[in-house]
């Protein structure tokens, strides 16, 4: 009987040693892999480029500015009441985005005059004209892509030409009445 109990104690001790050894190996492997995983995270300079704040106070009604965000041009336009009205009168059924292209969904509530768009044509990546006062704004008063003739309206929606979708709206928020944070 004593030898049988001794064998059980040996098996329990062996199982414990195997378990402890495996746990020790797992902790060792994790501590070796951690630096390799951490080096894949973005550093402080990359994180700083992921968002940008823009002061909108100097931009008067009817004016537009272009800023860079993640290396892409972002169009910011302080739209006039006439531009907003024209954008909202459009029959949404005739637009590629349908009801998802409603002007109200492309701007922030309470700041409907501010339109923020990624300034890259969705056809082949050209930069549309329409930001400067003398630029051609296309047939719909918004932007015109000179590469292949896409026309966007005052809400950045594709109205004519080969572009497959509307100009993209980047993630942004108003941090105050005159400042936005993109990204």
What is each PLM-predicted segment?
Residues 51, 62-66, 142, 169-171:
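Short, acidic/polar N-cap/turn motifs at the starts of alpha helices
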Residues 48, 59-61, 166:
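Residues that act as N-cap/strand-start positions at coil-to-secondary-structure junctions
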Residues 1-2:
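N-terminal intrinsically disordered, acidic low-complexity segments at the extreme N-terminus
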Residues 24, 28-31:
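Residue-level signal for the membrane-embedded core of alpha-helical transmembrane segments
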Residues 32-52:
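Aromatic-capped interface at the extracytoplasmic side
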Residues 89-183:
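Rieske [2Fe-2S] iron-sulfur-binding domain
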Residues 53-83:
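Short extracytoplasmic
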Residues 5-24:
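N-terminal secretory signal peptides and thylakoid transit peptides that target proteins
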């Amino acid at each position: 009987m004593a030898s049988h109990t001794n064998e059980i104690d040996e098996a329990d001790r062996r199982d414990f040693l195997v378990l402890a050894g495996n746990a020790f190996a797992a902790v060792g492997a994790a501590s070796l892999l951690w630096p390799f995983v951490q080096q894949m995270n973005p550093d402080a300079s990359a994180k700083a480029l992921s968002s940008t704040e823009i002061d909108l106070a100097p931009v008067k009604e009817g004016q537009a500015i272009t800023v860079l965000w993640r290396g892409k041009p972002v169009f910011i336009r302080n739209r006039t009441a006439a531009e907003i009205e024209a954008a909202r009168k459009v029959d949404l059924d005739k637009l590629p985005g349908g009801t998802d292209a409603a002007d109200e969904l492309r701007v922030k509530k309470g700041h409907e005059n501010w339109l923020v768009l990624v300034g890259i044509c969705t056809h082949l990546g050209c930069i549309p004209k329409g930001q400067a006062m003398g630029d051609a704004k296309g047939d719909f008063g918004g932007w015109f892509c000179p590469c292949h003739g896409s026309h966007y309206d005052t809400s950045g929606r594709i109205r004519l030409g080969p572009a497959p979708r509307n100009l993209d709206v980047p993630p942004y928020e108003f941090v105050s009445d005159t400042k936005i944070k993109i990204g």
